[in-house]
A protein has these predicted regions:
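Patatin-like phospholipase
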Residues: 1-40, 48-284
Length: 284
């Protein structure tokens, strides 16, 4: 079923994104496609294998490569400034080890919009499929979290994590004219972000980017406001929120395969449970 009036909105969350990847498996199994997708960070990474219609590809990455030091390690951070091995993730894996179906991805019947944060100007920069290119540099930028990944220089911009300004990128879908949303979150109901990063630490690491200091300081408030906005839409019958229904015991840097695979299984279950609600929302 190809939805026409309902957009898909994806939170990030690092390795908690395996929940979202499970939800996408349910969408693939039910041949559910969306006309418009907005994504940041891990959400942007994991949606790619859904768009290329490659079931269980993300799961196979976890099963075979998540403990590989090329994927995630302190060694990566020492060598490249990134704890995640982005060259391995965006080049070696899709082009050689677990081939990515670029043709199927390009044929996906909808628009993808991925945000990265311009830390010079303090604004979200959006990239569609064409702008992402074959190496997905904007997705890499969107996934580059402060302190554990270097600033990505792309097309004259200095970019970091798209979730800094658009943690739950629902507004982009509303601005595109979509009034109904499916929102995939990677936190339990009731979660609120509480603390920002101390400004003195930001000033010491990111001296050249004062806009980033303010963004990081305001991040908890911004996250909570965006979360409350989509929860309000759900109460009004304008959105379906899919999020973990069991207490999360995993953080964004957890690479224990058994925990990630269990979270993926849970995501599949939550995705299947939401299918009827998604179809009902579309038909309203």
């Amino acid at each position: 079923m190809h939805l026409q009036k309902t957009a898909l909105v994806l939170e990030g969350g690092g390795m908690r994104g395996m929940f979202s990847a499970g939800v996408f498996e349910a969408f693939l199994a039910h041949q559910l496609t969306f006309p418009y997708i907005t994504a940041v960070s891990a959400g942007a990474c994991n949606i790619l294998s859904y768009m290329s219609a490659q079931p269980l590809r993300t799961r196979q990455i976890i099963e075979h490569y998540v403990t590989d030091k090329r994927y995630f390690s302190v060694r990566n951070w020492i060598k490249s400034g990134s704890i995640f091995g982005f060259d391995f993730i965006f080049k070696e894996l899709p082009k050689h080890l677990l081939p990515f179906d670029y043709a199927a991805y390009r044929a996906y019947p909808g628009v993808l919009q991925v945000a990265a944060t311009d830390i010079v100007n303090g604004e979200s920069i959006w990239y569609n499929q064409e702008a992402l290119g074959q190496d997905f540099i904007p997705v890499r930028a969107s996934s580059s979290m402060p302190f554990v990944a270097p600033v990505v220089k792309h097309e004259g911009r200095a970019l970091l994590d798209g979730a800094l300004l658009a943690p739950i990128p629902y507004q982009k879908a509303l601005d595109a004219g979509y009034k109904k949303l499916i929102v995939v979150l990677t936190r339990n109901e009731g979660y609120r972000k509480k603390k920002g990063v101390p400004k003195f630490l930001l000033k010491s690491v990111y001296k050249k980017y004062p806009k980033l200091w303010d963004i990081m300081e305001q991040r908890p408030k911004l996250y909570n406001e965006q979360l409350e906005a989509v929860e309000k839409m759900e109460r009004e019958g304008k959105a379906v929120i899919i999020r973990p229904q069991i207490p999360l015991t995993i953080d964004k840097f957890d690479i224990k395969p058994h925990k990630l695979l269990a979270l993926h299984d849970h995501g599949i279950g939550c995705g299947i449970a939401a299918i009827d609600r998604i179809k009902e929302l579309e038909q309203q």
